[in-house]
Swiss-Prot record:
One GO biological process term: nucleobase-containing compound metabolic process
UniProt KW keywords: Acetylation, Nucleotide biosynthesis, Phosphoprotein
Subunit structure: Binds to PRPS1 and PRPS2.
Species annotation: Homo sapiens (Human)
Pfam name, any one: Pribosyl_synth
Keyword Acetylation carried by entry: yes
Phosphoserine: modified positions: 219, 227, 233
Residue positions where Phosphothreonine is found in the record: 5
Gene3D superfamilies xref list: 3.40.50.2020
Domain of life: Eukaryota
Protein name in UniProt: Phosphoribosyl pyrophosphate synthase-associated protein 2
Distribution of this protein across tissues and organs: Ubiquitous.
C-alpha cells in the first residue's frame, strides 16, 4: 500500500489533552482496518464496544466503557451492506449521546448515499435525509473526504470538514508513474473537468476532456418530472396557455478534446463504482493513441463485477484510497492499487480534539478543488 508521510507528521501524533475515545462502528472485521491504522497513528487504544447483528437482523450496540464528558470519535467505513452500516453508526451515536459524551464526531471517509443528492423523478434527496438523521441522533461534528457534491455540507446543521485526498493521489502520480511528465490528465466527461483541471495545473500537465459518451445518471435527461407538464397534458390546463418547452438534449458522437496520442492518459474522478463509463473512456483513449491508461479516484466502491471487467479492459492500473475496504476486489484484480489516507484523518482527529486550527489540512485548496 502506498503511503505518503510528510516530514512534519512523521513522528507519532501528540494528543495533548485527555478524554479522547476512538470507536469503530463496524460489525464487519474487514471494515476495521482503517480504524486500527488511525488508532496506531494517534497512539491510542480503540474504545471497547460490541457491535453485532441479532438473529432477527436487528443491530445492537453495547458500549463497554465510560464516555461521560469525553470527545468521542466514531469511525465508520461503508461496507457492501450500506444500510446496516448506517444503522450501526446512528445507534452508536445515540448511545454516546444518552451516555453524556461531551462531543460526538463522526469520521465517515465516504459519505453514503452521496450520489442521491439531487431530486430524481419522484424520488427524494436521500443524502439530506441521512444528514438530518445523523444530526438528530446526536452527531456534533463530521469529518469526511471528497464529498460527491460539496453542497452536501449544507445539508448539515453541524460543522463539516470535507478533507481532500488529491495530495495523496498527486504524490502517487509523481512517485509511482514513470515518465509521468509525458502524461495528460483526462476528464471522462465534462462534469469532471474541474477536477481534471485541478490535477493538471498542479502537475503542470495538459488536459483532455471526453465528450459525447452515453447518458449518465447525473444528467438532466433522466429527470422524469415534468413541470411544466408534457405537451399532451398542457391543453387540459388552459387552452390559452402556450408555455415553451425545453428542447431535449442530444449528445454528439464521442469526441476527445485534447491530444492524447503517444501519451500516458490519467483519468481522474471522485468515485469509481459502475465501471462502464471508465471502460468506454479507456477504449476511446486507446483508439486516439494513448499507450498507457491509469484511473485515479478517491472512493473505490467497485461494485458487482467491476474487478473482473477492469482486469479484462484496456486500463493498466486503478488507484484508489482506503476510504472504503476493497481487499477482496484487489485479490480479483491485481490492477487495483491502494493509497493510504489514514494520516490526514488522524491529524484531523488530533486537531479537533486539541482545539487546534484545521486550516493546515486545507492549504492551497481552492473553491474548485
Amino acid at each position: 500500500m502506498f503511503c505518503v508521510t510528510p516530514p512534519e507528521l512523521e513522528t507519532k501524533m501528540n494528543i495533548t489533552k485527555g478524554g479522547l475515545v476512538l470507536f469503530s462502528a463496524n460489525s464487519n472485521s474487514s471494515c476495521m482496518e482503517l480504524s486500527k491504522k488511525i488508532a496506531e497513528r494517534l497512539g491510542v487504544e480503540m474504545g471497547k464496544v460490541q457491535v453485532y447483528q441479532e438473529p432477527n437482523r436487528e443491530t445492537r450496540v453495547q458500549i463497554q466503557e465510560s464516555v461521560r464528558g469525553k470527545d468521542v470519535f466514531i469511525i465508520q467505513t461503508v461496507s457492501k451492506d450500506v444500510n446496516t452500516t448506517i444503522m450501526e453508526l446512528l445507534i452508536m451515536v445515540y448511545a454516546c449521546k444518552t451516555s453524556c459524551a461531551k462531543s460526538i464526531i463522526g469520521v465517515i471517509p465516504y459519505f453514503p448515499y452521496s450520489k442521491q443528492c439531487k431530486m430524481r423523478k419522484r424520488g427524494s434527496i436521500v443524502s439530506k435525509l441521512l444528514a438530518s438523521m445523523m444530526c438528530k441522533a446526536g452527531l456534533t461534528h463530521l469529518i469526511t473526504m471528497d464529498l460527491h457534491q460539496k453542497e452536501i455540507q449544507g445539508f448539515f446543521n453541524i460543522p463539516v470538514d470535507n478533507l481532500r485526498a488529491s495530495p495523496f493521489l498527486l504524490q502517487y502520480i509523481q512517485e509511482e508513474i514513470p515518465d509521468y511528465r509525458n502524461a495528460v490528465i483526462v476528464a471522462k466527461s465534462p462534469a469532471s473537468a474541474k477536477r481534471a483541471q485541478s490535477f493538471a495545473e498542479r502537475l503542470r500537465l495538459g488536459i483532455a476532456v471526453i465528450h459525447g459518451e452515453a447518458q449518465d445518471a447525473e444528467s438532466d435527461l433522466v429527470d422524469g418530472r415534468h413541470s411544466p407538464p408534457m405537451v399532451r397534458s398542457v391543453a387540459a390546463i388552459h387552452p390559452s396557455l402556450e408555455i415553451p418547452m425545453l428542447i431535449p438534449k442530444e449528445k454528439p458522437p464521442i469526441t476527445v478534446v485534447g491530444d492524447v496520442g503517444g501519451r500516458i492518459a490519467i483519468i481522474v474522478d471522485d468515485i469509481i463504482d459502475d465501471v462502464d463509463s471508465f471502460l468506454a473512456a479507456a477504449e476511446t483513449l486507446k483508439e486516439r493513441g494513448a499507450y498507457k491508461i491509469f484511473v485515479m479516484a478517491t472512493h473505490g466502491l467497485l461494485s458487482s463485477d467491476a474487478p473482473r471487467r477492469i482486469e479484462e479492459s484496456a486500463i493498466d492500473e486503478v488507484v484508489v484510497t482506503n476510504t472504503i475496504p476493497h481487499e477482496v476486489q484487489k485479490l480479483q484484480c491485481p490492477k487495483i492499487k491502494t493509497v493510504d489516507i489514514s494520516m490526514i484523518l488522524s491529524e484531523a482527529i488530533r486537531r479537533i480534539h486539541n482545539g487546534e486550527s484545521m486550516s493546515y489540512l486545507f492549504r492551497n485548496i481552492g473553491l474548485d478543488d
